[in-house]
Regions:
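Active-site-adjacent structural elements that line small-molecule/cofactor binding pockets in enzymes
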Residues: 1-173
């Protein structure tokens, strides 16, 4: 190859690199480069399709481009979601209103019409039902929870624990 390797050498480093793709086009580029795909809570595209549909397309295009590139390993795909299980009164106070009629949103970022994914906030059984319908979430290998750091470490740990205890097992994770 003629390439210099990174020192100190870390075997398998190339398989631990992720690219945060904000569009279907950059997801294809990531596949061609041979890096894992990280898809966030927004895409710099707005076609009229739902965020989950756009993101599912992004994942499918990534996997197709990966196959065409002929890489000799299977990449990982992560999606980010704002998910808040409501398990007590404090959760309801912080997030209860967000879950009522929450939808994707369209906005403009750096001149691009963009689609933003909705915030999931509901009691665990409702979350499981909603998340099972999120095609991109079901297509991914990993989910990253985006939570508001301004609520403090203890409350953020509560959110993560509520998700891990009440939601993830029902999704088969």
């Amino acid at each position: 190859h003629g390439r210099l390797r990174i020192e100190p050498h870390s075997p398998g480093l190339d398989r631990r690199i992720w690219w945060g793709a904000g569009s279907r086009e950059t997801a294809v580029w990531a596949a061609q480069q041979g890096v894992n795909l990280m898809s966030s809570t927004l895409l710099t595209e707005a076609t009229g399709d739902s965020f989950a549909q756009l993101q599912s397309e992004q994942i499918a295009l990534f996997r197709d481009a990966w196959k065409k590139a002929g890489h000799d390993w299977t990449p990982r795909v992560s999606v980010s979601r704002s998910i808040f299980p409501i398990v007590n009164e404090l959760d309801a106070m912080y997030f209860g209103a967000r879950g009522q009629g929450a939808n994707d949103q369209i906005g403009v970022i750096d001149g691009f019409r963009s689609t933003f994914g909705k915030t999931y906030a509901a009691e665990p059984d409702q979350l499981v039902e909603q998340l099972n319908q999120d095609t991109a979430l079901m297509d991914a290998n990993s989910v990253m929870l985006t939570i508001p750091s301004q609520l403090g470490v203890d409350y953020n740990l509560h959110i993560l624990e509520a998700f891990a205890t009440h939601v993830a097992p029902e999704l088969g994770w």
